Amino acid sequence: MSAKRNTKLRHAPLEHAYVDDKSVRRNKRSKQRGRMQDDESVDAPLNEKQAQVIARQAQLQQNEEDVSDSEQTGQPVDIDVPSDDEGQADDLAQPEDAYRHFEIDEHDEVALRAFMPAEPAQRRTLADIIMEKIQGKRTEVASQVSQTGPRELNPKVIEVYQGVGQVLSRYRSGKLPKAFKIIPRLKNWEEIVYITEPENWTAASMYAATRLFASNLKEKMAQRFYNLILLPRVRDDIAEYKRLNFHLYQAIKKAIFKPGAFFKGFLLPLCEAGDCTLREAVIIGGILVRKSIPVLHSSAAMLKMAEMPYSGATSIFLRVLLDKKYSLPFRVVDAVVAHFYRFNADHRQLPVLWHQCLLVFVQRYKEDITSEQKRALLDVLRSHNHYAITPEIRRELVQSKSRDREMPLEESSR
């Protein structure tokens, strides 16, 4: 009885079930390929037919929004947007929680003023950059008209994206205009963005735009967006409100999605400006603490910052990146040692931030430093002493192994 029961199969073999199953979609891959081909076709500049399609879609969407608004009681309604990782605990935290562990007192601010340029260059706001771009574009168009004839945008395209700019100037949440979503696929995307007047965007619009461009632009293009649009807006917001808007805080976190573009277009230009305030450095450094960044991009950024003229922002950003405990190349370690050794002949009072940064570096990479470099750092400690931090730095240097010696420095000197 059991033998008969074993010979009967209740189900067909799995391979036959897969082959014979007619419910499996076999044309999904071709649909995806066709969709990709359609996306690639948008890379060309807009012609008149495409401009009419965009204008029609934008008008339909605007009409739908107007109808829905008229049915309401006049109160703006926020529409929830699906998110990928915003539901995590660290994303729900307020921006102030990220940089609460950075403590800066008045003595640090006084000491850092000695390292600030006597007459810093006037910082350009986002509106200044937009006006400069517009003037440059007018000059370029005038030269093209005199040489090869007019090559301006279609007036319908300009009208559409001016309307998009009006939507973004009051955007809070929900769907972005369809005409705005195709901007990353346009060759003249930068010119189109300036038509929407980014200086008038809301903070929520800036976050949505950063999220869109970080996902769809190439690294060099994203770098330009971070440098020309996002960075000036963040600095303007901090300067005006003494804190960072939550949507801009999230925009910076999304910008780190492309770490190479973020460092080249946002963080390094901020350090090179020479007028980065401690408040800006603390806020942005707090965001870096929470994010995971690839070691290659962080190493290149540390190498560049170590070679820059000193500022308080440099100490904060170096400390944050050093505290991530990367396995750094020896070239980066040597550059950081040279960065600190430059102060051996500098008799100005150094802020506590500098001593804290040196302590973190020695704690994390004491065994990657040569014995000669350790002696050079000990010479620096004789010139610049902090009553609480310097003894700890000296102990870490003396009681640890070196890159070129297995024996601690204090035993080898006996």
Curated annotation (Swiss-Prot):
Keyword Nucleus: yes
Transmembrane segments: none
Localization terms from the record: Nucleus, Nucleolus
Residue ranges with Basic residues bias: 1-11, 25-34
Entry-linked InterPro entries: Bystin
GO BP terms, alphabetized: rRNA processing
Comp. bias intervals (Basic and acidic residues): 12-24
Biological role: Required for processing of 20S pre-rRNA precursor and biogenesis of 40S ribosomal subunits.
Protein's recorded name: Bystin
Species this chain originates from: Monosiga brevicollis
Lineage: Eukaryota, Choanoflagellata, Craspedida, Salpingoecidae, Monosiga
Name of encoding gene: bysl
